[in-house]
Amino acid sequence: MISKINFVKMHGLGNDCVIVNKRDLLNAHNLSQLAKNIADRHTGIGCDQFIIYENHNNFYEMIIYNIDGSSAKLCGNATRCLAKLIYLDTGKKDITIVVGNKELLCRIEDENKISVNVGAVSFNETWMPSRDKIWAFAARYMIDLKETICVDVGNPHLVIFSKLESQDQKIVGETLQAKELFANGVNVNFAEIKDNKINLSVWERGVGLTGACGSGACGSFAAGLKRGFIHSPSTVVFKHGSLNMKEENGNIIMQGSATLIAEGVYCCE
């Protein structure tokens, strides 16, 4: 029997997601497998993340899956996309989105400008290995990671303030998923700073190199502030656009666009 699922496809600076309302998942699905099937760019719809959301009156719950079927704790670009979708559906401009135990306060400035307060980040978590361990591990592959820092944005990030070619970014991104360093993997950010702007490339765990990463922008901005490399406000630049970043009372606030691509019905057996 074929099931039909209504979906919306959106992107934030080229980081695309397929969004489904939980009420449309009436039949029992293996959500991890469904995410993999939908994310496939040849046999599915194609996306970087698969998003399920549910309205709880005062807030919206968001569940995130990567293309490999693994779950994710945060996606900044998908958050902006979902906030815009809710705005288009309801007219609400102040929207609270909850992912796991993290509350994200969203504000629709206009249809092309959505702000997300991701709260405070942490530089001291049990999952974070020492810089010496990271350097020693990278040295096995003849890669010099000059300036690194771990940051938790609700999901784990490693920020590397060193210029690396794309082929080396791929090697480093894959290598640093080793269980001996990061038990559950890590998002690896390659940040270059010039004129108080961060040019950023991100290797997302469960995805690979992506066109943009909102949580990576937040983590890299916070890391740059901590190291004294930048000041607030700042801009994070990706291939397909940029995010405005600022810090207020210890909270990181991201502002950027979200774009509707398509609406349709996904058929699955």
UniProtKB/Swiss-Prot annotation:
Protein's cellular compartments: Cytoplasm
Major location category of this protein: cytoplasm
A Pfam short name: DAP_epimerase
Site feature Could be important to modulate the pK values of the two catalytic cysteine residues, where: 157, 204
InterPro entries named in the record: DAP_epimerase_AS, DAP_epimerase_DapF
Pathway: Amino-acid biosynthesis; L-lysine biosynthesis via DAP pathway; DL-2,6-diaminopimelate from LL-2,6-diaminopimelate: step 1/1
GO annotation terms (biological process): lysine biosynthetic process via diaminopimelate
Residue positions binding substrate: 15, 49, 66, 76-77, 155, 187, 204-205, 214-215
Entry-linked Gene3D superfamilies: Diaminopimelate Epimerase, Chain A, domain 1
Catalytic activity from the UniProt record: (2S,6S)-2,6-diaminopimelate = meso-2,6-diaminopimelate
GO MF, one example: diaminopimelate epimerase activity
Keywords: Amino-acid biosynthesis, Cytoplasm, Isomerase, Lysine biosynthesis
Active-site residue list: 75 (proton donor), 213 (proton acceptor)
A cellular component term, taken from the record's GO annotations: cytosol
EC number(s) recorded for this UniProt protein: 5.1.1.7
Similarity comment: family membership: Belongs to the diaminopimelate epimerase family.
PANTHER family noted in UniProt: DIAMINOPIMELATE EPIMERASE, DIAMINOPIMELATE EPIMERASE, CHLOROPLASTIC
Quaternary assembly: Homodimer.
Function description: Catalyzes the stereoinversion of LL-2,6-diaminopimelate (L,L-DAP) to meso-diaminopimelate (meso-DAP), a precursor of L-lysine and an essential component of the bacterial peptidoglycan.
Name of the protein described by the UniProt record: Diaminopimelate epimerase
Species this chain originates from: Rickettsia canadensis (strain McKiel)
Source lineage: Bacteria, Pseudomonadati, Pseudomonadota, Alphaproteobacteria, Rickettsiales
Name of the gene this protein is made from: dapF
